[in-house]
Amino acid sequence: EVALEYLKLSSQMVRDIVEALIGRLGVALDDSKIKGLLGQKMVNMNYYPACPNPELTVGVGRHSDMGAITVLLQDGIGGLYVKMEEENEDAGKGEWLEIPPIPGALVINIGDTIE
């Protein structure tokens, strides 16, 4: 019951985010376009507890998010990296930059579908 309520609320949140992003691009949206972008509803929850031997830690690895939107809630440990498309003061082009966690904040990743 709790998982179904979570799915319902998170699906609406993702829809609202997509509508805001695409709307800012000046694209008129209707339900068929939104359904095409969002595809089949999917929720994936990953939890990585602290490893007593950090040198043995294995994460998801370098990847891009294939869907439209990924919503992340980081813990205080961190481990989220972003590949830099352009050079800036923090990292060079093509380098991976760690994104430090902000307590209580959600990270919104734009996936391959929208990109």
Residue locations for each model-derived region?
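Peripheral, non-catalytic segments flanking oxidoreductase cores
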Residues: E1-E115
